[in-house]
C-alpha cells in the first residue's frame, strides 16, 4: 500500500473549532513508523489540552490502533514489518509538530514507543491501551519509583496491593482487574475508610481526578507516617495540608523528549531521561500484553467517525463518561 499525499485529520481551526480537514501526511523521521489508523480512543487529556492550550493547526489525539504502512530508515532495527497490527499513543495537540496526531488517517510513531497487537485483540480494544499504559508507567514506576522487576511483569511486579476509588457501579469491574478493594469516592468518609482498611499503612496515592476533594481523600487515606501523593494534573496548593506527604504531578507527554511551550505550569523542557524510561517501560508492557496480563479498558464504540469525535470530547468535558473509554472506528477493519 502506497500512502496518499493528503489525509483527513482532526485539527484545531483558526476559528478555534475542532474540525476534520484535508491535511498532508506527517513527515516520517528516521526512527518512526507510519501507521494507517483503524480506531482511536478518547482521553481526558484530549479534551483538556484542546480547551486549555489549543494550538491552531495542530492535529489532536493520542490513542490509536492500526497497521504499519511505511518505515523510517532506522526503524527496521525494532523488528516491525509492513502490515503489522500495532497500537500506542502520540503527543496530540503538539505545538512542535502540527502534522502529527492520532486523530488522523495516518500517524507517525517512534518505533520504540509502539506496541504490537496480539492476535486475540481487535483494533477497538487495542486503541484503549496506549495512554493508559504510558500514564501507569510514568506515574508508578518513574515518578513514584515503585520497584519494577521486568521478569515479574504480570505477577504483582511491584509487590503492592492496589486500592481504588470509583462509583459503586464500577466496584466489580475494578476488582476483576486486580484491585484489592474499592471505595466510593462520593462518600464523605472515603479517605478514613481507606486509612482504616489499610491499617494506616498506605504510603502512595495516585490521584486521577485532581481537585480539592480528591486530594483531601488521598491525604486522609495516607498513613500517619506520611507518604507520597501524585496527581495527573497540577494539584491545588491549598490541598497540601500535611507536611509529611510529598506532593507532585506528572505530565506523561514529557516521555517524547520534546520541549512543551505551553503556559505554566505545563511548560517543560525536553526530558531525555523520561524518554529512556518510556522505552524500557514499553518493552515491559509488551511482555505483559503478550502474556495476557493486560486487559483492555471497557470500551464504548461510538458512531460517526471523524465527525462524531468532537461530540465525544464534549461528553468528556461534561464529565458524562464513567467506567468506559469512548472509541471510534475511522477506517475499515
Swiss-Prot record:
The keyword Flavoprotein does not apply. One of its GO terms (molecular function) is nucleotide binding. NADP(+) binds at residues 45-48, 167-170, 185, 232-233, 321-322. Substrate binds at residues 131-138, 252-256. Keywords: NADP, Nucleotide-binding, Oxidoreductase. Pathway: Secondary metabolite biosynthesis. Induction: Expression is positively regulated by the aspyridones cluster specific transcription regulator apdR. Its EC number is 1.-.-.-. CDD domains: enoyl_reductase_like. Monomer. Belongs to the zinc-containing alcohol dehydrogenase family. Trans-enoyl reductase; part of the gene cluster that mediates the biosynthesis of aspyridones. The polyketide-amino acid backbone preaspyridone A is first assembled by the PKS-NRPS hybrid apdA. The assembly of preaspyridone A is initiated by loading of malonyl-CoA onto apdA, followed by decarboxylation to yield the acetyl starter unit. The growing polyketide chain then elongates into a tetraketide. The adpA PKS module catalyzes three Claisen condensations, as well as beta-keto processing and methylation. This is Trans-enoyl reductase apdC.
